[in-house]
Design a protein with these regions (language model features):
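Catalytic-core environment of secreted peptidases
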Residues: 58, 66, 70-103
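Midchain, well-structured core segments that form catalytic/ion-binding scaffolds
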Residues: 133-134, 138-301
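Alpha-helical metal-binding/catalytic segments enriched in His/Glu/Asp
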Residues: 86, 95-135, 223-229, 238-261, ...
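N-terminal capping segment at the start of a domain
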Residues: 2-41, 391
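Zn-dependent metallopeptidase/amidohydrolase metal-coordination segment
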Residues: 18-24, 87-88, 358-408
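A non-catalytic alpha/beta surface segment that caps or lines the substrate-entry region
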Residues: 30-75
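A short beta-alpha structural unit
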Residues: 36-40, 272-281, 293-295, 299, ...
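His/Asp/Glu-rich mid-to-C-terminal helical/loop segments that flank catalytic regions of hydrolases
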Residues: 219, 235, 239-265, 313, ...
Length: 419
């Protein structure tokens, strides 16, 4: 068998193994008809056990840390060397797909499996972590697992309860973990040299570009606001059009402005009016008040802030012209997370090697890399998903794309770990 044929066979075998393992993980669900696996549930602990077995088979030392992350280490040429950390999350949203998070953990295991089969050790160790909670489905707190690793887990999180009234502290105890030992999950800055995460794109850009893989430039920052137009309710038949103070008409005008201005700004900025409530909400009454939400995101904070200021200014102008009032309250803010430029370049080089060219794009969704990047240089590799669908049972990737992803990821990891 030629080297090319052998490499192709190895790629196909690795991809097939990842796809089969994703199916096995998908079977670990609290509901039979829809994949749901939340933090510290029996299914999460079963997933940890299974992933730990796969890590061990790939030649790794395996442990579960004090916040419920499953971890593995493949030693470097010198024992105790700093590690290149690979990972993603093993928890899901409700009624989830089977690749969000899991693909990154499984592909990372394949990187180590390949080195183990070849009997190779690199200058740096390689560690893999399957984070216990990225989604925040159970407790409404995101990045629990990765914040455990960075040592940025606030003590107040322990008292947060799920819908059944079970606190994080009690859930840890129920899982055989000790809430008093949370800090033991934190890694010293010198333990880790860099972090690389492989993840499905969760959007349509790679598919539209006809590419299997892309490199993330930044994880979008976000602002979320509760907004309100207040006018004057009135009889739908007796108040002339020129005398109306229609809150819904003002909101509709602003929504079109939100769309148009965001498109004009470009720069991968996005804006969404996701909810709208109209009062009094009767067919024969002019709307007197409209409450709506605004979600805006972008890969750089300054353009995002400028867009928000312009949108709020437009809302005030519309309200003033229509003799209404407008108010907005920001209730959520997260800064953009830039990926490390050197690691981006390494990933781009690896992607070009396997698919001929690369594409740089932002991540509109949050990832564990947000927390990890606060401590260590971090970067992400995206894999195309069918139709950009995610957080849904129809979430899908192809084995061919997974094979390319494993190849590119392996190249990048080896370059970083041997530097």
């Amino acid at each position: 068998m030629s080297d090319t044929a052998r490499q192709q066979a190895e790629r196909e075998a690795a991809a097939s193994r990842v796809m089969a393992r994703a199916d096995r993980l998908a079977a670990l669900s609290e509901t039979a008809d829809a994949l749901t696996r939340v933090y510290l549930s029996p299914e999460h602990l079963q997933a940890n056990q299974l992933v730990g077995q796969w890590m061990q088979a790939a030649g790794m030392m395996v442990w579960q840390d004090s916040v419920g992350n499953i971890c593995g280490r493949y030693e470097g040429q010198q024992e105790g060397a700093p590690a290149v950390l690979l990972g993603s999350h093993l928890d899901t949203v409700r009624n989830a797909g089977r690749y969000d998070g899991m693909l990154g953990v499984l592909a990372a295991i394949e990187v180590v499996q390949r080195l183990h089969q070849q009997g190779r050790r690199l200058a740096k160790a390689i560690e893999i972590v399957g984070f216990g909670d990225e989604e925040g489905t159970r407790f409404g707190i995101t990045l629990l697992g990765s914040r455990g690793v960075t040592g940025t887990w606030p003590e107040s999180w322990l008292s947060q309860c799920d819908t059944d009234g079970v606190s994080v502290a009690q859930a840890l105890v129920n899982a055989g973990l000790d809430p008093a030992r949370i800090a033991h999950a934190a890694r010293h800055p010198r333990d880790i040299a860099a972090y690389l995460e492989l993840h499905i794109e969760q959007g349509p850009c790679l598919e539209q570009a006809g590419l299997a893989l892309g490199v993330v430039e930044a994880i979008n920052g976000a602002r979320r606001l509760n907004c309100r137009f207040t006018g004057e309710a009135g009889h739908a038949g007796t108040v002339p059009m020129l005398h109306r103070k229609d809150a819904l008409a003002a909101a509709a005008e602003w929504m079109v402005q939100v769309e148009n201005l965001t498109r004009q700004r470009g720069g991968n900025l996005v804006a969404t009016v996701g909810t709208l409530r109209c009062a009094p909400g009767a067919v024969n009454v002019i709307p007197g008040e409209v409450q709506l939400t605004l979600d805006i995101r972008g890969p750089q904070d300054a353009p995002l802030t400028a867009l928000l200021e312009e949108l709020l200014g437009q809302a005030q102008a519309i309200a003033g012209r229509r003799q209404l009032s407008f108010a907005a309250e920001e209730y959520y803010r997260i800064a953009a997370t830039a990926c490390d430029s050197h690691l981006q370049a390494v990933l781009s080089e690896a992607v070009v090697a396997v698919q001929g060219r690369s594409l740089t794009l932002p991540s509109g969704a949050g990832h564990d890399a947000i927390a990890i990047a606060e401590r260590w240089p971090s970067a992400m590799l995206f894999v195309r998903c069918l139709g950009g669908v995610s957080h849904h049972p129809a979430e899908s990737v192809t084995a061919a794309d997974v094979g390319l992803a494993i190849d590119a990821f392996s190249r990048a990891v080896e370059k970083v770990a041997d530097a």
